[in-house]
Amino acid sequence: MGKDLRIKSKAFDGTMRAPNRAMLRAVGLTDEDFKKPMIGVASTWAEVTPCNIHLNDLALLAKKGVRHSDAVPLVFNTITVSDGISMGTQGMNYSLPSRDLIADSIETVVGAENLDGLVAIGACDKNIPGCLIAIANAGVPSVFVYGGTIAPGNVDGKDIDIVSVFEGVGQHNAGAIDDNQLRKVECNACPGAGACGGMYTANTMASAAEALGISLPGSSSNPAESEEKQGDVEAAGEAIKDLLEKGIYPKDILTKKAFENAITVVMALGGSTNAILHLLAVSHAAEVDLTIDDFNRIQKKVPHLADLKPSGRFVMQDLHRVGGVQAVMKLLHENGYLHGDCLTVTGKTIAENLAEAPALKENQQVIMPFDNPKREDGPLIVLKGNLSPTGAVAKVSGVKVKRHTGPARVFNTEKEATQAILDNKIKEGDVLVIRYVGPKGGPGMPEMLSVSSILVGKGMGESVALLTDGRFSGGTHGLVVGHISPEAQDGGPIAFLQEGDMVTIDSNKREISMDVSEDEIKLRQGKWEAPELHKKGVLGKYAHNVTCSSKGAVTDYLNRE
């Protein structure tokens, strides 16, 4: 008899556990199965979003892979929230909390059912960090599988995507397109299954997962509706058995060096600002000492190479065609930007995996060369100053303005700010501020894609700065600063900003400040009262437990310092 690979399901051995086994027999387990490791297949399948509509089929393929490796697969589901569908509505308040709900629910099932390993399948934005947090907390050998990117839509021979529709709303308001043109974009932007197609949050976090080594090589850029994606999930199911045999756990993979690799890849690809929030949260679960300042440290050294949307020309499917994320990682590793000695779910190191990976195709245009990058350093920067002492996040790729000073136009809700833009009350040079939308204040730190896209659609993407203690979608571009912390709800300086105060954003100095004296800030602070927190349900629990964005907006910080 071979080595017993069961880590936790040994708990079902013996006469005292006959009742437990009786219930497992009812779902199909046999005497032989009780000798094998039990592997959970966590799926975020749902019909509420195109990102996840195909995941049930992928879960069944993962189940097949687990069974093929002579282990016992047990499929279970968790929730998903569509950022794109909830955007601009009250539903967006539930988006970030869903990350932690996903993580908690997967960890709960793995723990409660005494599972020995895990294949976690996610697609939409919060699925991916939710799955990674669960993997880190559950602690059993695990592989993450990305559901894959959507294909681009097409109108009149031009590729479009979901952000084209958001920006179309602004173009429509400005009179640049009519009702029929907007409808044409709406009806053709999303042609099938898969996550939003640019280097937005889902594709960013999938790429980060591959760079971390917690997903299989090549899997982050394989499209949702492809044979390669089907192969990814079946191979992931088979890989778990190998991890069990070699005794490789998430803690062996999710190291400080691995997170530095992930940040490097995100910077090179021009990823979403949400990557900072999510990688901080995943590192917290993995008990890795990663801080918001690590992002600036790496940002200064890593060039932005990918000409991907939202600031570039191409989408993830185009990157797949020229070699995918593995080819980009190979290029980065060959030029000394990655730690090659990090362990991965293949049982090999990053360097060993990349030695077998193909290089980028010749004459491709998606990834720019080191001697002519899109930007000489990374596009995600952390700003600090008297408006955000513990850090704010900006994405500066494609933004020509390096310094902007203007009068604050202050709003306490996204709805009010949006209406002001549509009513042409926001002028060039203004600094549009949306506050009380942070993790606690929102609650849920909603994304401001609708607002930023309307500004871009109206031609004001670089003439009006947008600041918030909320978040931005990975599809956002323009002169935007989010994650301002401490947030207004916590009494951060943004709460004391008043209409007309002059605000300066300086990306070169990495500073964000208001031209208000310390004495005046203290005077305003003395008159300020915190609004009441949300009281009930999911959002109430979230508001009372979540930390600030500069710590990843996690809900289990507890007594850790």
UniProtKB/Swiss-Prot annotation:
Names of required cofactors: [2Fe-2S] cluster; Mg(2+)
Enzyme class (EC, first level): lyase
Tree of life domain: Bacteria
SUPFAM superfamilies named in the record: IlvD/EDD N-terminal domain-like, LeuD/IlvD-like
Coiled-coil positions: none
Segment forming the signal sequence: none
Binding residue positions for [2Fe-2S] cluster: C51, C124, C196
InterPro entries in the cross-refs: DHAD_IlvD/Edd, Dihydro-acid_dehy_C, DihydroxyA_deHydtase, DiOHA_6PGluconate_deHydtase_CS, ILV_EDD_C, ILV_EDD_N, IlvD/EDD_N
Name of the encoding gene: ilvD
This protein's record includes keyword Cytoplasm: no
Pfam families: ILV_EDD_C, ILVD_EDD_N
One of the GO BP terms on file: L-valine biosynthetic process
N6-carboxylysine modifications at: K126
Alphabetically ordered keywords of this record: 2Fe-2S, Amino-acid biosynthesis, Branched-chain amino acid biosynthesis, Iron, Iron-sulfur, Lyase, Magnesium, Metal-binding
Active site (record annotation): S473 (proton acceptor)
EC identifiers of the protein: 4.2.1.9
Family: Belongs to the IlvD/Edd family.
Pathway terms, separated by semicolons: Amino-acid biosynthesis; L-isoleucine biosynthesis; L-isoleucine from 2-oxobutanoate: step 3/4; Amino-acid biosynthesis; L-valine biosynthesis; L-valine from pyruvate: step 3/4
Subunit-level organization: Homodimer.
Protein name: Dihydroxy-acid dehydratase
